[in-house]
Amino acid sequence: MKRNGSRNCLNRRSRFGSRERDWLREDVKRGCVYLYGADTTTATTTTTTSSSSSSSSSSSDLHLVLCTVETPASEICAGEGRESLYLQLHGDLVRRLEPTERPLQIVYDYLSRLGFDDPVRIQEEATNPDLGCMIRFYGEKPCHMDRLDRILLSGIYNVRKGKTQLHKWAERLVVLCGTCLIVSSVKDCQTGKMHILPLVGGKIEEVKRRQYSLAFSSAGAQAQTYHVSFETLAEYQRWQRQASKVVSQRISTVDLSCYSLEEVPEHLFYSQDITYLNLRHNFMQLERPGGLDTLYKFSQLKGLNLSHNKLGLFPILLCEISTLTELNLSCNGFHDLPSQIGNLLNLQTLCLDGNFLTTLPEELGNLQQLSSLGISFNNFSQIPEVYEKLTMLDRVVMAGNCLEVLNLGVLNRMNHIKHVDLRMNHLKTMVIENLEGNKHITHVDLRDNRLTDLDLSSLCSLEQLHCGRNQLRELTLSGFSLRTLYASSNRLTAVNVYPVPSLLTFLDLSRNLLECVPDWACEAKKIEVLDVSYNLLTEVPVRILSSLSLRKLMLGHNHVQNLPTLVEHIPLEVLDLQHNALTRLPDTLFSKALNLRYLNASANSLESLPSACTGEESLSMLQLLYLTNNLLTDQCIPVLVGHLHLRILHLANNQLQTFPASKLNKLEQLEELNLSGNKLKTIPTTIANCKRLHTLVAHSNNISIFPEILQLPQIQFVDLSCNDLTEILIPEALPATLQDLDLTGNTNLVLEHKTLDIFSHITTLKIDQKPLPTTDSTVTSTFWSHGLAEMAGQRNKLCVSALAMDSFAEGVGAVYGMFDGDRNEELPRLLQCTMADVLLEEVQQSTNDTVFMANTFLVSHRKLGMAGQKLGSSALLCYIRPDTADPASSFSLTVANVGTCQAVLCRGGKPVPLSKVFSLEQDPEEAQRVKDQKAIITEDNKVNGVTCCTRMLGCTYLYPWILPKPHISSTPLTIQDELLILGNKALWEHLSYTEAVNAVRHVQDPLAAAKKLCTLAQSYGCQDNVGAMVVYLNIGEEGCTCEMNGLTLPGPVGFASTTTIKDAPKPATPSSSSGIASEFSSEMSTSEVSSEVGSTASDEHNAGGLDTALLPRPERRCSLHPTPTSGLFQRQPSSATFSSNQSDNGLDSDDDQPVEGVITNGSKVEVEVDIHCCRGRDLENSPPLIESSPTLCSEEHARGSCFGIRRQNSVNSGMLLPMSKDRMELQKSPSTSCLYGKKLSNGSIVPLEDSLNLIEVATEVPKRKTGYFAAPTQMEPEDQFVVPHDLEEEVKEQMKQHQDSRLEPEPHEEDRTEPPEEFDTAL
């Protein structure tokens, strides 16, 4: 293959051919670089919605260059005839590559940091043109017209100076740059005199006498004016738009941020009046024409922003700009500062956040006017001593550094410091050098550290303390000046404040281990907000509830059983009592708390409610009432209507059977009503009087009549799913406000086409779709089913989407997903539509669940294209598939997630979390990774102020802080796995794993279960988008893939054994395929096995049983059929019952001959058979077997068992009898009788002399109450079914005739997917 200049770089190609691909396969260090030209940039800027692949394919100047990871940019430039190569990340900034940089290695490193591990896969991804949305190379620097307009406008136009007609029009070069209009004195020449017209504070006017003309005027009494005439309307509008921004400014500010600049525009130096220059997010160079070394030319410059320029070294020449008062140099990779910085004597604000600084120079202390110094997210291990000299500073802002010790003595020496911000450090201990009090520090922020004990009692002037998300066990403070205390998410058992904080207004002690409310909090006279939720409180002090200043009290998630009775009137406005153990509320609650507007008493045990009326008239001002998940009955309804100002009422999951029409009629202010999860049969017709009602949620009831809600003028959301609706009465005109109508789960509801046409204007109409029978769905429908619920809450749009495929990958698996875009709906919908296809492709390429799941997320991240550059989404994907890697399981569940969506598995009634929450607050490792990458984490815990997530799909512009690599977990599914819950962030913020599992594990319908979860979240205070999916799992015997499923087990030839068979209890799992073998292996004990004759409940089994040569490998068992332990018998009793009812009534005298080796007692036959045996490794080498072996199935095979027939020598051979196609088909019919061919007089198809060694058939199993089965009396030994060698062909012929002569009835629905079990019954 021809190379260009070097063996490392090949000629450019316009497409991939076979020769190029062969060359790439030879070495993973080879690859290609897509090179975009200038015309490609135009296509990209004009078509913002097209993907990278489409734009690249349509571009005439796009081509690829084959190269290696060692090929430098200079070599590619030489081969392409270019001066430089340019790199663009995420469709944003463009920087020039250095000649020594290696483009292909840059791509490989980028993909590796995203999460790709396999070098071959990295090579493959690098050749994908879709990657251009994240990383691309240009042969020329792209020029975006809209950005150029904001930097500089220029052209040759007709110009006239002055307002009068004395001057003539003449063609001149006109430039608009910075704050000035520049007009040359000579046409198309800048060598002559340049006329400068400052525009700040001036004005721009339209010249009416001349088309497309503007008049530019400067400010002041001596204002000058220039008239400029443009040729086109587009030019006229561009100049007018940009000039209007300049003249509207009060100060001379130039914003050139995010323009990929390497130097200052030449014409900008004409604007000598510039005072503030913003150059952040560029690639400014230090030493080059127009670089940072020329900024000293701006003689009046006061403010300079050079953040995010990746300078690496501090530009020393900046220290010569003595006029600077503000300087921002954050996120530039500085490791130290020069001593010359002390020359900036006028500097007042210096921002150095996001660098690698460990010390500050002493010369910084010369800046006596410095009042703000930001050194957050650096590498300081202690507070710099220079703070003591900077007396104008009043704040120590050092968030995100490496401090491990809090030395209060250092702070005591800084008398000028009032605010201390040390959040997100590594603080573990605190040092107090002396007992001297500190009277100057008023605000301290110690969030997200590792403190276990904190004593700040020496800070007697402390007004506000943030110490949340530590590991505090005890907290001691001074209460002289304390006004606000945030101490949530710790392990506090004691909080000591002395003296009583008389100025305290806000106290947050939530999510701790407090057993009582501190006494000092009860005595605080000005406290307005108290949050002690998520603690261990058992009682509420009277003084707290009776406080005359308290406005908001949060007591949720405690163990409170009673509330004190109110005696005096209180000003309480918000009361949260959810998740306690309350059985009643104080009788005087509503009569004494007249200002109460919000009450949440959900998840308690309330059976009644206090009256809202003190006399004949109600004075209640209650507006929001949440009483979900209690024990309320119809008797509470008359009490509720006393709250005439109710706007939101939640009564879900109670015991309501009726809602009196006369009572609902009184709630005229009602806007939202939730009655779901009750036993209502109707909604009163008086609901039509609730004219302000916009939301009605009444799912999971017994409603059969559609309520009269379509006449409400403001109705928007109606949820009547999971009811008994049969028809809908539609008015003549539907309300235009109706946006969402949910009628799913009403199995008897049939909507005509006319009705659907009327509902066509509704944005979201949810109805049941009748599924079409498919072969794929019948395979997996037995194993799992799902229900989905999504609610917008108080938001205007739904930004949560879900993916649900019960039949996936040709019907052998299932895929479920949840996507949460937070504030955007585009990305969740894109992922909903594309992620399953990506998974299917990846599954075909790899069988490793970690590999194909990770690649699914990474490829989906790439496929988001331009939409994923600025937007992001949390993603959760669950894949159920047959477990081929683990022979001990039937199905495996693989879960992958990024962001805050989570999946929880219910196993044996207990929750098993399968996901990881990638957020700064809940994942310290991820928070440290983001800190190490020098991201700026704002006070609300968001990366660069955008998102709290550290891993997402999309948001590529936040790379490398935000990554798409998912957390992956796999678990084998067992019979104990009941259901799987998928939910977004809002769901899990308001429901614990245990509560979610307990709330739905007994709900029969998965749709109703998902609805219930969303309703609970909303009733618990969720106002955001909430989404929940519940997947019911039915992994039983029919899902088994081990060698025990449907197999018969041999016993030693001629080894007669008997067991006394007793009645057994009904299995705990009512599935017809719930595994007799597995039940026996766990239930049988030594006392249950009789040893009258030939009992094998001893070690004699090894001597008389199978030869060890017949066991080439260990048995492959699943959780449904575990391997017997030493405490269990190796041989287990069969579930077969042997009856003589199959024999003819008229028998010959030969029928009375006794069977040798079988002992009967007149009523029972004791038989022991081994039903656990290994499958032969190679069935193909077995001797010839009978093609069609008869099988006996009871008509109700849900309670019976079917037994396969083994040849007489099959026990010795260790091989199982394979079933033919005919036998399998006949086996599905529950009405198929025992025999295929003609029976002899003794009920067998073989002579008696050949029928003494094998049991013939097994009849229906009686109800089992113990480990034994009672057999019919008078067992006839001739009823054994034998197939000797010499009659095999005759047996096959007779069975075939029998099968052809009988019609196979239609099987039951449950029998289609649950084939009967089979066991060998050889003695």
From Swiss-Prot:
InterPro entries: Leu-rich_rpt (IPR001611), Leu-rich_rpt_typical-subtyp (IPR003591), LRR_dom_sf (IPR032675), LRR_domain-containing (IPR050216), PPM-type-like_dom_sf (IPR036457), PPM-type_phosphatase-like_dom (IPR001932), RA_PHLPP-like (IPR055071). Residues 1292-1315 have a biased composition (Basic and acidic residues). Binds 2 manganese ions per subunit. Mn(2+) is inhibitory below pH 8 and activating above pH 8. It is found in: Cytoplasm; Membrane; Nucleus. Residues 785-1033 form the PPM-type phosphatase domain. Keywords: Cytoplasm, Hydrolase, Leucine-rich repeat, Manganese, Membrane, Metal-binding, Nucleus, Phosphoprotein, Protein phosphatase, Repeat, Tumor suppressor. Inhibited by AKT1, AKT2 and AKT3. Activated by oleic acid and arachidonic acid. It catalyses: O-phospho-L-seryl-[protein] + H2O = L-seryl-[protein] + phosphate; O-phospho-L-threonyl-[protein] + H2O = L-threonyl-[protein] + phosphate. Mn(2+) 2 binds at D820, K985, D1024. GO terms for cellular component: cilium; cytoplasm; cytosol; intercellular bridge; mitotic spindle; nucleus; photoreceptor inner segment; photoreceptor outer segment membrane. Residues 150-248 form the PH domain. GO terms for biological process: hippocampus development; intracellular signal transduction. LRR repeats lie at residues 250-271, 273-296, 300-321, 323-344, 346-368, 369-390, 392-412, 416-439, 440-460, 461-480, 481-502, 503-524, 526-547, 549-570, 571-592, 595-616, 621-644, 645-666, 669-690, 692-713, 714-735, 737-758. Its EC number is 3.1.3.16. Changing F783V: Decreases activity. Transmembrane segments: none annotated. GO terms for molecular function: metal ion binding; protein serine/threonine phosphatase activity. The modification Phosphoserine is found at S1210. Residues 1060-1157, 1285-1323 are annotated as: Disordered. It is a peripheral membrane protein. PROSITE patterns: LRR, PPM_2. Its main location: cytoplasm. Interacts with AKT1, AKT3 and PRKCB isoform beta-II. Interacts with STK4, RPS6KB1, RAF1. Interacts with FKBP5; FKBP5 acts as a scaffold for PHLPP2 and Akt. Interacts with NHERF1; NHERF1 scaffolds a heterotrimeric complex with PTEN. Protein phosphatase involved in regulation of Akt and PKC signaling. Mediates dephosphorylation in the C-terminal domain hydrophobic motif of members of the AGC Ser/Thr protein kinase family; specifically acts on 'Ser-473' of AKT1, 'Ser-660' of PRKCB isoform beta-II and 'Ser-657' of PRKCA. Akt regulates the balance between cell survival and apoptosis through a cascade that primarily alters the function of transcription factors that regulate pro- and antiapoptotic genes. Dephosphorylation of 'Ser-473' of Akt triggers apoptosis and decreases cell proliferation. This is PH domain leucine-rich repeat-containing protein phosphatase 2.
